[in-house]
């Protein structure tokens, strides 16, 4: 079953966003590699695995400036600090 956003506003980037396509390919490969085994908590696992490198790379890009990184991510600085602590990145 193919899932396509029914409303244009659901899609923030172009329909063939390179990042979105890359993520889709990785998820398809992961599901294929499960080889019939159940994946528990896949949603949270994918979010965590995407969020950690996103936070690290944005912080590197902002030369460690958490205020700039939070602004670039579109989140409050307190939220960024909470996530960094949660993932053991501080």
Curated annotation (Swiss-Prot):
InterPro entries (alphabetical): Fis_DNA-bd, Homeodomain-like_sf, HTH_Fis, Trans_regulatory_Fis
Domain of life where this protein originates: Bacteria
SUPFAM superfamilies to which the protein is assigned, alphabetical: Homeodomain-like
Disulfide bonding pattern of the chain: none
Any Pfam family hit: HTH_8
GO process terms (BP): regulation of DNA-templated transcription
Keywords: DNA-binding
Keyword Transferase: no
Signal peptide start-end: none
Residue ranges of the annotated DNA-binding region, renumbered to this chain: 66-85
Keyword Glycosyltransferase: no
Gene Ontology molecular function terms on file: sequence-specific DNA binding
Similarity comment text for this entry: Belongs to the transcriptional regulatory Fis family.
NCBIfam families referenced in this protein's UniProt entry, alphabetically: PRK00430.1 (NF001659)
Entry protein name: Putative Fis-like DNA-binding protein
Organism: Xylella fastidiosa (strain Temecula1 / ATCC 700964)
